[in-house]
């Protein structure tokens, strides 16, 4: 009898810090232009999105700050730069919408997730507005209060 394959998650990397530092407003799915060694490294789980963001140059979107560590068995015939800028593949309407969002004061575009969709690597990017220190404290208070409410409800149901 054949063994069942373990169900792997499609998520490669998450940017949890983005949810802490920004108010996430609108999300978009973008393709990522990668080299062969980068795809192989992502299959091994070597991707990281902490402090990654999107810039716009010449009508194109570029992902900065994303790190993909090369595998030790990667070819030595070319330079493997873990933090190189990677082109994001978006439709023209999405590009203009994102560019307009970044022109507002305090808004930026950050990468929130990197995942597999069929055999392709996709990057979830989002327009975001920066949080100030008191905003971060407020969300933490709300989170703690929600946990306390759940505990109270569970003890009352017993």
UniProtKB/Swiss-Prot annotation:
Residues 131-158 are annotated as: Disordered. This is SsrA-binding protein. GO terms for molecular function: RNA binding. It is found in: Cytoplasm. InterPro entries: SmpB, SsrA-bd_prot, SsrA-bd_prot_CS. PANTHER family: SSRA-BINDING PROTEIN, TMRNA-BINDING COMPONENT OF TRANS-TRANSLATION TAGGING COMPLEX. Belongs to the SmpB family. Residues 132-147 have a biased composition (Basic and acidic residues). SUPFAM superfamilies: Small protein B (SmpB). Signal peptide: none annotated. Keywords: Cytoplasm, RNA-binding. GO terms for biological process: trans-translation. Required for rescue of stalled ribosomes mediated by trans-translation. Binds to transfer-messenger RNA (tmRNA), required for stable association of tmRNA with ribosomes. tmRNA and SmpB together mimic tRNA shape, replacing the anticodon stem-loop with SmpB. tmRNA is encoded by the ssrA gene; the 2 termini fold to resemble tRNA(Ala) and it encodes a 'tag peptide', a short internal open reading frame. During trans-translation Ala-aminoacylated tmRNA acts like a tRNA, entering the A-site of stalled ribosomes, displacing the stalled mRNA. GO terms for cellular component: cytosol. Gene3D superfamilies: 2.40.280.10. The keyword Amino-acid biosynthesis does not apply. It comes from Teredinibacter turnerae (strain ATCC 39867 / T7901). It comes from the Bacteria.
